[in-house]
Regions:
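Active/ligand-binding-proximal structured segments within catalytic/core domains
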Residues: 1-19
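Charge-rich, well-structured scaffold segments of protease-associated domains
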Residues: 17-184
Length: 184
């Protein structure tokens, strides 16, 4: 849902066009199950500003994109844009069906289901089509808000950067009071 649009860029196409205007900046999300927890990975890659023909602060633009996606998604009346929600739900359902048709993935799911019978290990990290049908738009948005308010957050900055970059994040990223920032 996070890559489906924001208030400022209300569709996937508008978001993609904006990223393209920022020298092809990439932005993506994925979700993984680790033990009994979920890890939401949000990543973005942009060109090093030293390679631009003129001075433009892409890092601040990148941070603003994080703010838009996390804190200003395309939401009205406590739920995501209906059309975007329907599209994303359909895409996920199709991925789940394809994974169930993949013999290796199906076998792996069955292995964990039998090994961890009655425990967390038996729960598919991909989810279930039957459960997806019951999930509502409002529930997904409510869960996002709960995660933003309550979950542990870490930010990793990788690249040709110095420690002063932490100040740029603190000045421009809303969530920094709840976040550990790591430089690599």
């Amino acid at each position: 849902m996070l890559t489906g649009g924001t208030e400022n860029y209300p569709s996937t196409q508008a978001l993609s066009t904006h990223l393209e205007d920022l020298y092809g900046m990439s932005f993506g999300t994925n979700l993984a199950t680790k033990g009994i927890g979920q890890v939401l990975n949000i990543s973005s890659v942009c060109i090093n500003e030293t390679f631009l023909p003129y001075q433009e602060n892409l890092l601040v633009q990148q941070i603003k994109m994080f703010n838009d996606v996390l804190f200003h998604p395309n939401v009205r009346n406590g739920k995501f844009d209906e059309q975007t929600f329907a599209i994303k739900k359909k895409e996920l359902k199709e991925r789940l069906i394809v994974q169930n048709d993949d013999k290796f993935m199906y076998g792996l799911d069955q292995l964990f289901k039998n090994m961890g019978e009655g425990g967390f290990l038996s729960i598919s990290n991909n989810g279930y089509v039957e459960e997806l049908d019951r999930i509502t738009n409002e529930e997904v948005y409510k869960y996002l808000v709960e995660c933003l308010e309550n979950d542990v957050k870490h930010l990793y900055v990788v690249g040709d950067v110095d420690e002063s970059i932490v100040d740029v994040f603190k000045e421009n990223l809303i969530v920094t009071q709840y976040m550990d920032i790591h430089l690599k």
